[in-house]
Amino acid sequence: MRSFNSFRQESCSDATSSSGRIRTKSKSLSVVSLFISGVLLAPVSMAADEAKPATDATKSANQALMKELPFDDKTGFELAHKGFIAPLPQEQIKGEQGNLVWDPAKYGFIKEDQAAPDTVNPSLWRQSQLINISGLFQVTDGIYQVRNQDLSNMTIVEGKEGITIFDPLISTETAKVALDLYFQHRPKKPVVAVIYTHSHVDHYGGVRGVVDEADVKSGKVKIYAPVGFMEAAVAENVMAGTAMSRRASYMYGNLLPPSATGQVGAGLGTTTSAGTVTLIPPTDIITKTGETKVIDGLTYEFMYAPGSEAPSEMLFYIKEKKAINTAEDSTHTLHNTYSLRGAKIRDPLAWSKYLNEAIHMWGDDADVMFAMHHWPVWGKGEIVKHLKSQRDLYRFINDETLRMANQGKTMVEIAEDFKLPDALNTYFSNRGYYGSINHNVKATYVLYLGWFIGNPATLHTLPPVDAAKRYVDMMGGTDALLKKAKEYYDKGEYRWVAEVVNHAVFADPSNQAAKNMQADALEQLGYQAESGPWRNFYLTGAKELREGVNKLPVPDTASPDTVKAMSLELFFDYLAMRLDSEKADGKKIVLNFDFTDQKEKYLLEMENGVLNHTLGAEDKEANASVSLARTTLDALMLKQVTLEDALEKGDIKITGDQEKLTELLSYLDNFDFWFNIVTP
């Protein structure tokens, strides 16, 4: 899963020069971090009477899937139950402030022996049943997993002197409870190592719940990660953080109640915890495939897999245990080569080649394969079969998309016509519970050919509102459009209704009748969706069409670890992205920055509505020079000190025209998290 951080920095303004100090309207330079999809947002329930039942068309579509897939195959359930030791504690997990972090009973309505409701795709329901097989499990001798204590699994390996933990979940609170559960059933040995398999927050955020940083600094605990981990963990989504976070509140269904007409999980796991996110930098970096490390008496061979499921990722094999850890590159779902929250597109061809490499490196020797989501696979033959199937799945997406593109088909046409070979299509672990064939194919097209399909009619289309008004006019007005759309709705053509009625909504967002019809269509599409994120997008869209956007408080909970890990280069890039070019047009500001504790200097130049920075440069004619320690910058971003106080204490020294710093900050844009998605 994908981690992300959105930072919002409050601008400072209204300087007064008489005192020679900068006075600020906002009392601090603040940063807000939102990790994966509004994890910190408490779910808001829809009123029970707003969710409508499944229509006959939806029931029929879901029943048809029952005939397409081998639902009588119970292998997945046997694997998910294997090695069970103890259930999860059923008490709610709360943070220091009494905030709800994790509710293990939240998805209790999903029963293993219960048929899918009419309002849930039966294949997604099956996946959610499997994910909800929770607790502490033995993978093999000396390897244990805690599953469904968060979005991801936490793995514990017993070594010579202590234990090694793989991927300590999202939050310190959930990670601590997971470790406590393990200790209730196994000897209480010290944690001697942590392995981060990749750079997404559900694989490192709870680290301070299982180890003390003092032990890391003293050398008692080592932390292993792939090269580029820190850069990717902090930077992957900073620049588009607000947009990604808002869209991810749709993707993970954070605004939906868990229910048969609401959220049933994300396909990769149930949902995200809402606790304290931390990050301790790794002590040991894995740089290449074939690199080996002896960790607490066990031999690990690593495969470096950058640009697969994450920018920085690694798989590995534990020789003495004959165990492959595939990180998140091979689980029990088709993963995302593009995340609907928004992200850079991942390369399915490279992904396929990494899995092929894993087969040839370890397939002849492994007795068990496990990942950081879902349940393991046991037995050489079954492991190789699974890896080959997923290898071929990603390779087929790449190759078939390009084959059809070279026939002249467009992105949407390819996604519509795309068919997997039957052996790949009917293997449950290849189904699109998290990713989907449709949106992964579209992503692959864009990866190679970009957004333009080649038809000049689509080269410079009107923006949504302008186009919508003209569509409605050409269709004879909103009433005529809705009347005709209702006929299509009654025939079960919900995709077409959603496409057409969207024009009515964007032409006149005050028309509740149009929004209600659009919501009804999206809701039925959600009930039919096999992908958890698709279902969540559809149902959240329906909710906001009916109710409007509920602007919940966005908590100011910047993670100190993440802020401290943010490079100065990234910090200045982020400031530049926030520059409001209209406000800054025609203005010129030049500032020298000297970070005394890091012995780094930066030159900031604002001109032409752009903010550039240069490491190691200095301008003697600059408007002002600013001197401070990096620790002071961190304290400002975390709101531990105000800009005015830092100036008064001498933690920040400014020579030259002090008001120019305030002027620059006044040009920085602030972003509203709750921007509209399903309305203009």
Describe each region flagged by the PLM.
Residues C12, A47, E493-E499, F506, ...:
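Feature captures hydrophobic
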Residues K52-N62, M66, A323, T333, ...:
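Divalent-metal (often Zn2+) His-rich catalytic cores of metallo-beta-lactamase-fold enzymes
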Residues Q129-K189, E313-I318, K322-E328:
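Conserved beta-strand hairpin/beta-sheet module of binuclear metal-dependent hydrolase folds
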Residues Q138, G162-T172, Y224, M230-A305, S312, ...:
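Metallo-beta-lactamase
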Residues E161-G162, T172-K222:
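Active-site metal-binding motif and surrounding structural segment of the metallo-beta-lactamase
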Residues K469-V500:
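Alpha-helical segment of the N-proximal tetratricopeptide repeat
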